[in-house]
Structures are given as structure tokens and as C-alpha cells.
Amino acid sequence: MNTVRVTFLLVFVLAVSLGQADKDENRMEMQKKTEQGKSYLDFAENLLLQKLEELEAKLLEEDSEESRNSRQKRCIGEGVPCDENDPRCCSGLVCLKPTLHGIWYKSYYCYKK
């Protein structure tokens, strides 16, 4: 009975020690693979970042050109009600409260300066 226990104990110790060695080797292999993967991901990330920066530069360039050439957009003409806090009267007009006619509307209108 003692020989069976000793044999079992010996086999158990060998299995555990060999299993640990395999586990350490597997760990080292996984670390190598993840390091290689990280370097690839870093490269891909940098490449994507460069492309996005180029695209952003092109878009900003187009926006600046558009703003230089653009006309005034959607404005309110003379005699049209406007908002006191957000006047969108066309150039040369001011958002004012009416003096005589239209006082009963309690609204502001676009008038010439």
C-alpha cells in the first residue's frame, strides 16, 4: 500500500512540475504573440491617424474656401417679424419694435437703419 502511495505521489509531482513548465512556455509564447500584435496594431493605428488627419485638413480647407465665397444665407426682409434675441434681418436692416402701426402685434420687425 505504501508503494502505491509513493508511486502515486511521484507521478503526481512529475505531472505538476511538467505541467507548470508547459504553462510557463505557453505564457511566454502568448507574450511574444501579443507583443507582435501590439506592434502591428500600433502601426495600423498610426496609419489610420495619418489618413484621418489628411482628410480633416482637406475638409477644413474646403470649409474655409466655402466661407470666403459664400453669400449671406436666409435673412429676413424689411417689414417682416423678427426675434428680438436672435435677429436674422438682412444686411442694412435692424430688428426694432414698431413705432405706430403694428404696436398691437407685440412683435419686433426688420426696419432700415
Swiss-Prot record:
* Signal peptide location: 1-21
Q: Which InterPro entries match?
A: Toxin_22
Cysteine disulfide links: C75-C90, C82-C95, C89-C110
Which GO MF terms are attached to this record?
sodium channel inhibitor activity; toxin activity
GO CC, sorted alphabetically, is: extracellular region
Q: Keywords for this entry?
A: Disulfide bond, Ion channel impairing toxin, Knottin, Secreted, Signal, Toxin
Quote the record's domain comment: The presence of a 'disulfide through disulfide knot' structurally defines this protein as a knottin.
Query: What is the protein's name according to its record?
Result: U11-theraphotoxin-Hhn1a
Q: Which organism is it from?
A: Cyriopagopus hainanus (Chinese bird spider)
